[in-house]
């Protein structure tokens, strides 16, 4: 075994895989430490990728040069476009994944990747010097691996405990090993830890459930994919359906009669669980007025014999879980392969991180994923990619990649984590992004592909394909502006017959697209440049034309905000010397130590008056470093 690496990544989940691949692809000698060789990028909870905001993150990962989108496309059982009846700012792609094939795909990518070693041992601690600079890790056999940077992506394995009713025992997900020594190292380094919780529902045997009364939830009959490079699509007739059922009054009564047996309500658990993915008993307590709740029955893999009971996670003891399951319609004879459980684990306070995802007070140590207080595979993968990129760039002496809130949902997430902190597992939502009309599902490439190319993760071939992609959009918009249709044209007749539009005079194709009721597919046969475009390209054209005024106004606002990002705050500033700064603002600014005025303005507890005082102080004390208003 080698003993010296550039980058060591601890944990082979979704964050760890992206971090390790990014580092290795940037020519860094990289080690990925994982407890099991066959458990890479597993899906211990929901067997799906994407969804509102999260699906856009997957496309952002792809645009930057990550792997998740390709894996999700290659192993999709069903593909669905969500929120299509609403505004384009909240459209989102979601795939039901074959979890076994997804993990196998990522294992193969890891094994084939140059510069990357997979080491199946436990990390028992961090090696660091007296200056709080991490220099490597300890393995379970007391071997030391040296590194220039270490990235911790331990997910829910960090000092984790499984909870079922009053039963509580040390374990990782699915009764796998847990990781304990790293927590002690973090505490010894002065890093503040928190305790969070999540949970997962039961897996039930397919042949024990009758879904004849369930509502079928099919995929979307469109050529949809996460990755820019995906060119093959699973036809709708070959996609696997999901099913929708509802809990019953009996289910509710079982919960109410046994609430004190739940780990959540018996006092066994004091840690905080995810607000947007609550246990079923949580739903019953929090929404007392509701007698029933939605439950989705989802396939996990074509190679298996189980259903995933989405929306039915619980920390009830097994005997109560059985009653709960058998109260569901079609589940009267259900047999269970894996029971539901809650899991409690250590994570850090992310306000201790810099925007690069390196710890502020510990050099060469990066963290990504659920250890940073987030939930979800996509959030983890996005952080892992950024951590892997920035660890590599630090070794090369380059500035970190820091995505702004107007550039990416990944930027929104990291900015929220480091400036606002978390008090419950953080989940990305479209409502967290103030510029969501700019952060759309269709335009991840045009937002971020340039970054991916400059970083070094986009190949020459993919870059050439992207340039063609952009040129095709530009050519189509040009042609739409030039071509005109009279009221007697075949297009006008078609639109009138389908009650999409009544062209009373001559219109350009561009003007026709502006009509909200018009489907761009009606124009395809009349405009040659539209015929070769992908779904995402067509969506981009419609949105850019139809929402032209809104997009322009949003970009003007962003231009003003970017100026605040350029106003740097010196690292040696003493906030106690800033006159008329509120006490809370001083405390928060000192703790977070923002890099610029834009970041400072987004910190909870720092108000506009505080920012004005800070600007005044900077102009006075650092006249050569501050930027003019």
Swiss-Prot record:
FAD binds at residues 11-16. It is found in: Cytoplasm. GO terms for cellular component: cytosol. GO terms for molecular function: flavin adenine dinucleotide binding. Keywords: Cytoplasm, FAD, Flavoprotein, NAD, tRNA processing. GO terms for biological process: tRNA methylation; tRNA wobble uridine modification. Homodimer. Heterotetramer of two MnmE and two MnmG subunits. Belongs to the MnmG family. This is tRNA uridine 5-carboxymethylaminomethyl modification enzyme MnmG. It comes from Mycoplasma capricolum subsp. capricolum (strain California kid / ATCC 27343 / NCTC 10154). The gene is mnmG.
């Amino acid at each position: 075994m080698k003993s010296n690496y550039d980058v060591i990544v601890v944990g082979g989940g979704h964050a760890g895989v992206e971090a390790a691949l990014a580092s290795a692809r940037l020519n860094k000698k990289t080690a990925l430490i994982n407890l099991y060789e066959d458990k890479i990028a597993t899906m211990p909870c929901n067997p799906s990728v994407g969804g509102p905001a999260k699906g856009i993150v997957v496309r952002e990962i792809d645009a930057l040069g990550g792997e998740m989108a390709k894996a999700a496309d290659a192993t999709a059982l069903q593909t669905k476009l969500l929120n299509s009846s609403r505004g384009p700012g909240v459209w989102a792609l979601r795939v039901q994944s074959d979890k076994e094939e997804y993990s196998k795909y990522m294992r193969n990518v890891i094994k084939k990747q140059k510069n990357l070693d997979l080491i199946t041992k436990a990390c028992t601690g961090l090696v660091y010097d007296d200056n709080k600079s991490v220099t490597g890790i300890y393995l379970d056999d007391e071997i030391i691996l040296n590194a220039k940077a270490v990235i911790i992506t331990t997910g829910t394995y960090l000092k984790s405990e499984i909870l079922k009713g009053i039963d509580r025992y040390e374990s990782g997900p699915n009764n796998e090993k847990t990781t304990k020594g790293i927590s002690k190292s973090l505490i010894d380094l002065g890093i503040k830890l928190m305790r969070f919780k999540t949970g997962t529902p039961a897996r039930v045997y397919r042949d024990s459930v009758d879904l004849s009364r369930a509502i079928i939830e099919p995929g979307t009959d469109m050529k949809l994919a996460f990755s820019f490079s995906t060119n093959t699509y699973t036809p709708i007739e070959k996609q696997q359906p999901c099913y929708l059922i509802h809990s019953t009054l009996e289910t509710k009564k079982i919960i109410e009669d046994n609430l004190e047996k739940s780990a959540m309500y018996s006092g066994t658990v004091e840690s905080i669980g995810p607000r947007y993915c609550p246990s079923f008993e949580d739903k019953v307590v929090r929404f007392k007025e509701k007698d029933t709740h939605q439950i989705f029955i989802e396939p996990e893999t074509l190679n298996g014999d189980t259903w995933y009971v989405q929306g039915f996670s619980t920390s009830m003891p097994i005997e109560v879980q059985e009653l709960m399951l058998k109260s569901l319609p079609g589940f009267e004879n259900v047999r269970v392969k894996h029971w539901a459980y809650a899991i409690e684990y250590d994570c850090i306070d992310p306000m201790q991180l810099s925007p690069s995802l390196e710890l502020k007070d510990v050099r060469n140590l990066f963290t990504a994923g659920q250890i940073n207080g987030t939930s979800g595979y996509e959030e983890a993968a996005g952080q892992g990619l950024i951590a892997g990129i920035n660890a590599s760039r630090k070794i090369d002496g380059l500035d970190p990649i820091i995505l702004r809130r107007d550039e990416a949902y990944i930027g929104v997430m990291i900015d929220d984590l480091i400036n606002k902190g978390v008090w419950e597992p953080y989940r990305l939502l479209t409502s967290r992004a103030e510029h969501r009309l700019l952060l759309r599902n269709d335009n991840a490439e045009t937002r971020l592909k340039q970054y991916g190319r400059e970083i070094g993760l986009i190949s020459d071939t993919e870059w050439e394909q992207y340039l063609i992609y952009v040129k095709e959009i530009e050519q189509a918009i040009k042609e739409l502006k030039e071509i005109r249709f009279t009221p007697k044209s075949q297009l006008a007749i078609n639109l009138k017959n389908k009650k999409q539009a009544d062209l009373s005079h001559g219109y350009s194709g561009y003007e026709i697209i502006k009509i909200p009721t018009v489907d761009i597919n009606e124009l395809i046969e009349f405009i040659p440049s539209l015929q070769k475009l992908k779904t995402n390209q067509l969506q981009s054209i419609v949105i850019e034309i139809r929402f032209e005024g809104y997009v322009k106004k949003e970009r003007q606002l962003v231009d003003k905000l970017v100026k605040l990002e350029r106003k740097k705050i010196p690292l040696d500033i003493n906030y106690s010397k800033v006159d008329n700064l509120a006490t809370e603002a001083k405390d928060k600014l000192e703790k977070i130590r923002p890099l610029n005025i834009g970041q400072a303005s987004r910190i909870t507890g720092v108000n506009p008056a505080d920012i004005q005082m800070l600007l005044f102080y900077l102009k006075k004390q650092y006249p050569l470093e501050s930027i003019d208003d």
